[in-house]
């Protein structure tokens, strides 16, 4: 599978390569099969950095520690309602509040869709998801961020992640 894909820009109709190797992801789903499937798709797109969490609590800890560029989450989790989880991620005081979120759910009512939109979700996908649909939704997020913020949230997150990695490397050197 090719590591670089192209997508269409809605602005000018031009194609541009989407470099998945520079985008990190956090997949949040209590179903191991779903996490493996999404991870496989992301690796197929060329992504190298994919984290997984089986619960909201684990995801919050991972998000704070790794600063992923995009979070892909289910709504139905054993430890916390998905909407509450999203609101915790998007709390204005949280450093992770600017991370784009894709909801990937097998059960999405109109009420739930309205709720997640109001909570600040960037994209909604219904399970089962195809690689094409996942790719298109990720591309839309990247395109929006690139158009909206010249130093994008992606760049800011990359800087934070580099600082975290540097700190971890320093901590390991002390051992």
Residue ranges and their predicted role:
Residues 55, 81-87:
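Acidic catalytic/metal-coordinating carboxylates
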Residues 52-70:
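Acidic, metal-coordinating helix/loop segments flanking the phosphotransfer/catalytic sites
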Residues 77:
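Receiver (REC) domain active-site loop signature in two-component systems and cognate sites
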Residues 127:
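A Lys-centered signature of the CheY-like receiver
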Residues 39, 84, 97, 108-123, ...:
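Alpha4 helix (beta4-alpha4-beta5 surface) of REC/receiver domains from two-component response regulators
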Residues 32-51:
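Two-component/phosphorelay signaling modules centered on CheY-like receiver
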Residues 3, 9-18, 140-175:
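CheY-like receiver
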């Amino acid at each position: 599978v090719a590591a670089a894909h192209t997508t269409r820009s809605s602005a000018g109709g031009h194609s541009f390569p989407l470099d998945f190797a520079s985008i990190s992801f956090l997949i949040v789903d209590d179903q191991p099969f779903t996490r493996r499937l999404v991870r496989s798709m992301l690796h197929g797109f060329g992504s190298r950095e994919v984290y997984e969490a089986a619960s909201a609590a684990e995801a919050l800890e991972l998000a704070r520690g790794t600063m992923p560029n995009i979070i892909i989450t289910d709504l139905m989790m054993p430890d916390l309602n998905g909407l509450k989880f999203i609101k915790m991620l998007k709390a204005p005081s949280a450093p992770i509040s600017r991370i784009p979120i894709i909801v990937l759910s097998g059960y999405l009512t109109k009420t739930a869709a309205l709720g997640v939109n109001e909570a600040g979700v960037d994209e909604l996908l219904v399970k089962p998801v195809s690689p094409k649909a996942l790719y298109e939704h990720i591309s839309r997020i990247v395109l929006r961020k690139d158009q909206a913020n010249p130093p994008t949230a992606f760049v800011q997150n990359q800087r934070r992640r580099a600082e975290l990695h540097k700190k971890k490397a320093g901590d390991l050197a002390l051992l």
